[in-house]
Swiss-Prot record:
It comes from the Eukaryota. Residues 269-286 have a biased composition (Low complexity). It is found in: Cytoplasm. GO terms for biological process: ribosomal small subunit assembly; translation. Required for the assembly and/or stability of the 40S ribosomal subunit. Required for the processing of the 20S rRNA-precursor to mature 18S rRNA in a late step of the maturation of 40S ribosomal subunits. One of its GO terms (cellular component) is cytosolic small ribosomal subunit. The keyword Ribosomal protein applies. GO terms for molecular function: structural constituent of ribosome. The gene is rps0. Keywords: Cytoplasm, Ribonucleoprotein, Ribosomal protein. Component of the small ribosomal subunit. Mature ribosomes consist of a small (40S) and a large (60S) subunit. The 40S subunit contains about 33 different proteins and 1 molecule of RNA (18S). The 60S subunit contains about 49 different proteins and 3 molecules of RNA (25S, 5.8S and 5S). Interacts with rps21. This is Small ribosomal subunit protein uS2. It comes from Penicillium rubens (strain ATCC 28089 / DSM 1075 / NRRL 1951 / Wisconsin 54-1255). Belongs to the universal ribosomal protein uS2 family.
């Protein structure tokens, strides 16, 4: 929790702390960078560094105040080359009006004004200082402030505001971006208070594997198609529930009814076959006799 000497706005709610712990935002890596030592709470027996959740919350509120101080929301550029943060930065940009760069950062975006992708933001926010090193380096050339989500092993060179958190887990990254967007909207007046429930759930900021989602959709479609085929087959075959209760001769013994129906069908088929056979024999015999009688006559005429 935040120290008591700080303003009340820095005090998080119990639900916020529970969400940070559930998303494992407090779990760092086994390596520790010297500038991240002030944000360390303790070292676990297995060598994992545990971050101070209270300081994480303080930096989220501080970063939100910096973002809200910029008049034009489009002058804020949010960047994530890490796949787990690309969905989060896109959602953050859509909710706050910022400019998102999800995926590979093209070198020269902040320094080469000839390129079409040239941008002049007043503030950039990166998901990982290590994977987004090119963006931080170019921001240092043109004096752009940098806010970064930093793990215990993240380099903090040219980072102005470091938010200590786990920047490698999909849930931790999504939750921090969601809380940052919520605080920005609260400071802008879109949300009345922090206790006001935001209609955007945090799940929208979590990374989703496209292949897993596609396989899930295919499996759901196959299940629905199989159920439809089974239902259609039952209707076409006539084996509905009410047909079994129909009162008919032999209804109590389905085998007897089936045998009687089969015998009747076989007798009808045999009668039809004999009749057709007799007609076929009669029609084929006459042409054979006529051909035999006519053939020798033709031969005698030629000789």
């Amino acid at each position: 929790m935040a120290p008591s000497q700080l303003p009340p706005v820095f005090n998080p709610t119990a639900q916020d702390i529970e969400m940070l712990l559930a998303a494992q935002c407090h779990l760092g890596s086994k390596n520790l960078q010297v500038h991240m030592e002030p944000y360390l709470w303790k070292l676990r027996a297995d060598g994992v560094n545990v971050l101070n959740i209270g300081k994480t919350w303080e930096k989220i509120v501080l970063a939100a105040r910096i973002i809200a101080a910029i008049d034009n929301p489009a002058d804020v550029c949010v960047i994530s080359a890490r796949p787990y943060g690309q969905r989060a930065v896109l959602k953050f940009a859509s909710h706050t009006g910022a400019t998102a760069i999800a995926g590979r950062f093209t070198p020269g975006n902040f320094t080469n004004y000839i390129t079409r992708s040239f941008k002049e933001p007043r503030l950039i926010i990166v998901t990982d200082p290590r994977t987004d090193a090119q963006a931080i380096k170019e921001a240092s050339y043109v004096n752009i402030p940098v806010i970064a989500l930093c793990d215990t092993d993240s380099p903090t060179d040219f980072v102005d505001v470091a938010i200590p958190t786990n920047n490698k887990g999909r849930h931790a990254i999504g939750l921090v971006w969601w809380m940052l967007a919520r605080e920005v909207l609260r400071l802008r007046g879109t949300l009345a208070t922090r206790e006001t429930e935001w209609d955007t759930v945090v799940d929208l900021y979590f990374y989703r594997d496209p292949e897993a989602e596609e396989n899930k959709e295919i499996a759901d479609e196959s299940k629905v198609a199989g159920a439809e085929e089974i239902g259609a087959g039952a209707v076409e075959s006539g084996f509905a529930g009410e047909n079994w209760d129909a009162s008919a001769p032999g209804a109590g013994n389905p085998g007897t009814a089936f045998a009687a129906a089969s015998a009747a069908t076989g007798a009808a088929a045999a009668t039809s076959w004999d009749a057709e056979g007799a007609d076929w024999a009669a029609s084929s015999a006459a042409p054979t006799t006529e051909w035999a009688e006519a053939q020798p006559a033709a031969g005698e005429a030629k000789w």
